[in-house]
């Protein structure tokens, strides 16, 4: 029996508002536990929620960027459940009238594009955060009442790789809109994955398992890969898949049962009595739509059409708004687009990945990178020398021209000076000349290496090659 994998994702995104969704409590990350909460967040008797309009605007903005239809009439509902991190014993969410529906985004895996549907996008409040220790459990209610959007995909993904690509694209779009920073390490983007298997050709879905506590896109992919294998083994051996919630354990690289999955009936949804229905007219929608900036796909197309970048470069540069904005500022300062792209995708990304940092954490600026790239273009420094300048720029900052002067890194492009060096090297390496004339091309590489060594890497490489061949042909 051949089985087909069905994957759908539920993504929670914390909105970057200054106050919480139903109270004036601040939303700063990293504050002392239980210092950013109020009687409204904690559900004290007699208090009433007040809807944060900015949260609604942000939700609409995200929904529009994800090609959703925006509701004209929407409302809030109570989702009833009891956990220690939920002091009210209910969560204010949206059940049957979400703010956005029927959206989609396009992903690309192995060169093939695919549209993934988005069932709905709705607003809700976040819960507190529980921390379990050997001595007991602690609860921080700072997160309680933070504004969230939940984005529910259609079950359109068929592989864990597609799920990864979907998350990467979704994160990129949301970051570009500016409604969230989408930092998984800070909990501002969280993902639950639903996966089931069914015989190829069957329309009815199989019984799904939900994977929770997936704190990176890589864990989402690995968790789905393991669950795919687990369910396949169970079904092929005649077993039955139970509807349950599981978590991915990185140590064992397996998914582990957490609990039997609840259905929506278990939450006893009913309309939130303390909030009126919300009506969104066309003028409000257009006001929000006008605030949406250029999104990654449009920016990618512009890089290819206007700047002449390869599609791959454009894709990598637009994955994050931070990198794309840095690229734009560097090119706007006069640097060549392709050369800038090469440095950002090469040395810059390699440094950031190795140091586990973001662009905002390093001393390199668009103006600094632009000046360095222009020095390469002018022939003042070679690409090899530029790496020494780059190391200084990204660690300490500064002016590339001043760094080049202070360290004596100016490229030697004077033909007379280089010809003297070449002549001296050839005089001391007659065997290499013979080897080259006898067809051993590697000999030229050796000679170039000796010249670069003699000039401390500062010789102009194209000019060295030209002079070297001229001098060899004279002998």
Curated annotation (Swiss-Prot):
Its EC number is 6.3.5.-. Pfam families: GatB_N, GatB_Yqey. It catalyses: L-glutamyl-tRNA(Gln) + L-glutamine + ATP + H2O = L-glutaminyl-tRNA(Gln) + L-glutamate + ADP + phosphate + H(+); L-aspartyl-tRNA(Asn) + L-glutamine + ATP + H2O = L-asparaginyl-tRNA(Asn) + L-glutamate + ADP + phosphate + 2 H(+). One of its GO terms (molecular function) is ATP binding. Transmembrane segments: none annotated. Signal peptide: none annotated. It is an enzyme of class 6 (ligase). InterPro entries: Asn/Gln-tRNA_amidoTrfase_suB/E (IPR017959), Asn/Gln-tRNA_Trfase_suB/E_cat (IPR006075), Asn/Gln_amidotransferase (IPR018027), Asn/Gln_tRNA_amidoTrase-B-like (IPR003789), GatB (IPR004413), GatB_C_1 (IPR042114), GatB_Yqey_C_2 (IPR023168), Gln-tRNA_amidoTrfase_suB_CS (IPR017958). Heterotrimer of A, B and C subunits. Belongs to the GatB/GatE family. GatB subfamily. This is Aspartyl/glutamyl-tRNA(Asn/Gln) amidotransferase subunit B. It comes from Bacillus thuringiensis subsp. konkukian (strain 97-27). The lineage of its organism: Bacteria, Bacillati, Bacillota, Bacilli, Bacillales.
């Amino acid at each position: 029996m051949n089985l087909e994998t069905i994957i759908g994702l539920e993504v929670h995104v914390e909105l970057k508002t200054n106050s919480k969704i139903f109270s004036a409590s601040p939303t700063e990350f990293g504050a002392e536990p239980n210092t950013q909460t109020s009687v409204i967040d904690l559900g004290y008797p007699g208090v009433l929620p007040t809807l944060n309009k900015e949260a609604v605007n942000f939700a609409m903005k995200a929904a529009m960027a994800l090609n959703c239809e925006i509701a004209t009439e929407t409302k809030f509902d109570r989702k009833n459940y009891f956990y220690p991190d939920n002091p009210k014993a209910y969560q204010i969410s949206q059940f049957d009238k979400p703010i956005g529906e029927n959206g989609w985004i396009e992903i690309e895996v192995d060169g093939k594009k695919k549209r993934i549907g988005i069932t709905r996008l709705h607003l809700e409040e976040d819960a507190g955060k529980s921390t379990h220790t050997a001595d007991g459990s602690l609860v921080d209610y700072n997160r309680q009442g933070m504004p969230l959007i939940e984005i529910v995909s259609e079950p359109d993904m068929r592989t864990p790789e597609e799920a990864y690509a979907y998350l990467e694209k979704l994160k990129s779009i949301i970051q570009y809109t500016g409604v969230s920073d989408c930092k998984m390490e800070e909990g501002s983007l969280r993902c639950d994955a639903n996966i089931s298997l069914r015989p190829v050709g069957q329309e009815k879905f199989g019984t799904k398992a939900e994977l929770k506590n997936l704190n990176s896109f890589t864990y989402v992919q690995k968790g789905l890969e393991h669950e795919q294998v687990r369910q396949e083994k169970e079904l092929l051996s005649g077993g039955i898949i139970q509807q349950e919630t599981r978590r991915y354990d990185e140590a064992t690289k397996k998914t582990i049962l957490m609990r039997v999955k609840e259905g929506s009936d278990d939450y006893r949804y009913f309309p939130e009595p303390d909030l009126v229905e919300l009506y969104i007219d066309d003028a409000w929608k257009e006001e929000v739509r006008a605030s949406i900036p250029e999104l990654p796909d449009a920016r990618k197309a512009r890089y290819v059409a206007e700047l002449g970048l390869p599609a791959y470069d454009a894709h990598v540069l637009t994955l994050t708004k931070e990198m794309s904005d840095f690229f734009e500022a560097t090119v706007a300062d006069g640097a060549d687009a392709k050369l800038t792209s090469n440095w950002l995708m090469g040395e810059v990304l390699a440094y950031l990945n190795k140091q586990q940092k973001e662009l905002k954490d390093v001393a390199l600026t668009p103006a600094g990178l632009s000046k360095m790239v222009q020095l390469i273009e002018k022939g003042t420094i070679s690409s090899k020398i530029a790496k020494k300048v780059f190391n200084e720029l990204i660690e300490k900052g500064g002016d590339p021209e001043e760094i080049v002067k202070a360290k004596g890194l100016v490229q030697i492009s004077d033909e007379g000076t280089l010809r003297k060096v070449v002549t001296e090297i050839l005089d001391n390496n007659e065997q290499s000349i013979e080897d080259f004339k006898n067809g051993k091309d590697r000999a030229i590489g050796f000679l170039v290496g000796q010249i670069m060594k003699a000039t401390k890497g500062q010789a102009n490489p194209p000019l060295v090659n030209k002079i070297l061949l001229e001098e060899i042909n004279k002998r």
